[in-house]
Amino acid sequence: MPEDGAGDGGEVPALIPDGEPLREEQRPLKQSLGSSLCRESHWKCLLLTLLIHACGAVVAWCRLATVPRLVLGPEAALARGAGGPPPTYPASPCSDGYLYIPLAFVSLLYLLYLAECWHCHVRSCQAPRTDAHTVLALIRRLQQAPPCVWWKATSYHYVRRTRQITRYRNGDAYTTTQVYHERADSRTARGEFDYSAHGVRDVSKELVGLAEHAATRLRFTKCFSFGSAEAEASYLTQRARFFSANEGLDDYLEAREGMHLKDVDFRESLMVFADPRSPPWYARAWVFWLVSAATLSWPLRVVAAYGTAHVHYQVEKLFGASSPPPGAVPSGPPLSRVATVDFTELEWHICSNRQLVPSYSEAVVMGAGSGAYLRGCQRCRRSVSSNSLPPARPSGPRLPFSRSRLSLGAGGRATPGVFRSLSGGPLGRRGEDTEPLESPPCYEDALYFPVLIVHGDSGCQGDGQGAL
């Protein structure tokens, strides 16, 4: 809540609890006339109003205007025989029943106009009306509410069913069998982001100046962000683990995710008045219907939109803003990267927690002895990027994981595989001293045996190396 300052007499936002820095202020903005027209044009009401007034102008023209009409009969024949002008008389241009056509259009358009006004009134009443103090208390509860980032996975399939329906053709009823497919949910799983090891903090803005406007339309949204790379990696890892664990359980998978605030009633739209018991004249119901009956609803809506201030308040939660508590325990094994789900071998190492995959910059500056801890292990020799080159070129530069791929061999053979360079150049060309590459396996072998590295339960204990 803002309070008066002692020196400059301005407003200073309140301090966030726990000694955090001051929040950034946010004020409602009053739009110009052109901006209010672009924001809420109410084109249906404007179009119906113009059509009603056009039909009314046609009716008035038919009743008030006169046109000369020729006189038929003996008098006209005598006038033509005498060589004078033909006799005429003034008459209405919409005689002979043509006046009822614009009247019918006016009646129909007026009914449509009243229906559109009723829909507009219902939409305006859907937003709850409250005062500024209640809104500030609600914002304080939103800022203090703990977030919950959730995931939902629904496994389902379609069941073929039949039903009997009756159809009519040429007055005869006949029964036919209709085949349709009905969705059947087989399993539903829910998960939440565990941020206890990273902490969370509210970084929403401080809303001030609500009492300065007679009417303010407030729109709420919520979002979250990350203050550290560790928190973002933990979120992506938990999310990928959740959806990968629920993938393939049925024919189809419906994935949903979102965020809600616990123990608080979140409303997306509010109408705030300085005094809800006496709102401005353009926001009263009897004024709206009185003006609408006179087909002046569109000008009233323009005045109301111009006199209403707007503010979009976003509740934002920041994960990873504080250091983890002393007793915090990670929710699972530390998976380094989730962008390697398409690489079978790297994903196997990550899920098994056997090795940490370096980033591209780390792999470029990796030294010659970075893979020495695995050279003694015959079963892990193929998982090190320093062994990705053919043995005939031991002193050549090394390829990072992101620039090489494994040439798949037979599933049960112990012959070390060879990495092929995708970057071209000397590393991608086969020299005379390069060993011949193994032929790739067939599609079925690669599909059923995607992982060529087999580790025992004891890791590398048998080869004299510790577990990674």
Curated annotation (Swiss-Prot):
Organism: Homo sapiens (Human)
Topology term for the membrane: Multi-pass membrane protein
Family, similarity comment: Belongs to the TMEM151 family.
Outcome (variant: residue 319 to L): In EKD3; uncertain significance
Outcome when changing residue 68 to L: In EKD3; uncertain significance
Keyword Transcription regulation: no
Cellular localization per UniProt: Endoplasmic reticulum membrane; Cell projection, Axon; Cell projection, Dendrite
Recorded disease: Episodic kinesigenic dyskinesia 3: A form of paroxysmal kinesigenic dyskinesia, a neurologic condition characterized by recurrent and brief attacks of abnormal involuntary movements. These attacks can involve dystonic postures, chorea, or athetosis. EKD3 is an autosomal dominant form with incomplete penetrance and onset in late childhood or early adolescence. Symptoms are usually triggered by sudden movement or stress, and resolve in most patients in their early twenties or later.
Predominant location: endoplasmic reticulum
Bilayer-spanning residue ranges: 45-65, 98-118
Full protein name: Transmembrane protein 151A
Known outcome of mutating residue 358 to L: In EKD3; uncertain significance
Effect of residue 166 to K: In EKD3; uncertain significance
A cellular-component GO term for this protein: axon
Effect of residue 272 to A: In EKD3; uncertain significance
Keyword Glycosyltransferase: no
Resulting phenotype, residue 276 to L: In EKD3; uncertain significance
Swiss-Prot/TrEMBL keywords: Cell projection, Disease variant, Dystonia, Endoplasmic reticulum, Membrane, Transmembrane, Transmembrane helix
Superkingdom assignment: Eukaryota
Effect noted on mutating residue 282 to C: In EKD3; uncertain significance
InterPro entries tied to this protein: Tmem151
Pfam families in the cross-refs: TMEM151
Region (Disordered): 1-21, 384-438
